[in-house]
């Protein structure tokens, strides 16, 4: 079996080496692992890149070749005990109690043996009463540490070493009990299971909101208890090659979800849609629908907050691949008013509907088109809007001056054929200078 496994590993290593060599030949002369980065950055066609963070929040990372891992874990024993699984924790604590009883049982047996309590004719004043074998010494250690006190075995005043051993075992037993109880309570109060009632939508959507392309996903809290100081974060992970030729397998880029405006802090009583505006600072600024389908990245979303019952911080994670970003979709409403109350229907939590007329181009192209349209609109006017208003105001003032002159002439009167002075009828005219 060992030889077959070794052969399989060797063949796998050779195959991987051949594939890497073939990739380097296709890419041409480039930088290799000893300082040169591979030329291709995008994943091969037809190959799906594995998730860095799974949908349930677990990180798809495995640590290998760690030097001194056991010593590092033992140096932080309490955290190690809290992080391990329950079965290993119970096994560790059972072995700890058993080792403690065996250790002090051996100490009691040695004290009794050195005093001569195990001899055929027992001494008149033994160190321990009714302790004549190792099994009896083990039972005495168990009864002492657990405070069972059956009333048969006991320590006498004959041996000070025996009294000191009993005192030492009581202290060690208290310390061990405190450690075990603290670790168990910390593990039980760990807010890890709170994440089971915090959910993310299965897909994220890209649609227009307030005339801007936005990336949106939904979060919800299934419990009636609130998540205190809840806030969201997001990061985009993708491979990148720097201008210096350094290849970064997973480059972390922050995705703005309203940190500056405070919209990243949410009141998670009902499901909320998190919005990322795709602007010039967004890593998705140059991606349209077609480019998004061919992109190679992973969007990691994080929800953090304090559990209301324990005030302990919890973190819920999920991720979205490009295939899980639905372009031109919106989420169905989940909050409805029923009488004097609001009702949340989680049947619609993951559902989306298509929005006709959503542009398929990138946000950058939309901004360029809007800028071109504004330039063409401005070029159609010979002057600015201020100049246009000023010309109309000037024409209106001139018209008012003409009216005043006419009123003066009207006061003097104009003679008619019969010699009577008749008033002059004036028709004011507003001269507006309109742009061509």
UniProtKB/Swiss-Prot annotation:
Which residue intervals are topologically Cytoplasmic?
1-83, 188-436
Annotated catalysed reactions: K(+)(in) = K(+)(out)
Q: Does the keyword Cytoplasm apply?
A: no
In its keyword annotation, does this UniProt entry include Repeat? no
Bilayer-spanning residue ranges: 84-110, 160-187
Cysteine-cysteine disulfides = none
Primary location class: membrane
Q: Residue spans with biased composition (Low complexity)?
A: 426-436
One GO biological process term: potassium ion import across plasma membrane
Superkingdom assignment: Eukaryota
How is expression of this protein distributed across tissues? Answer: Expressed preferentially in retina.
Q: Which residues lie within the membrane without crossing it?
A: 134-150
Which protein, by its recorded name, is this?
ATP-sensitive inward rectifier potassium channel 14
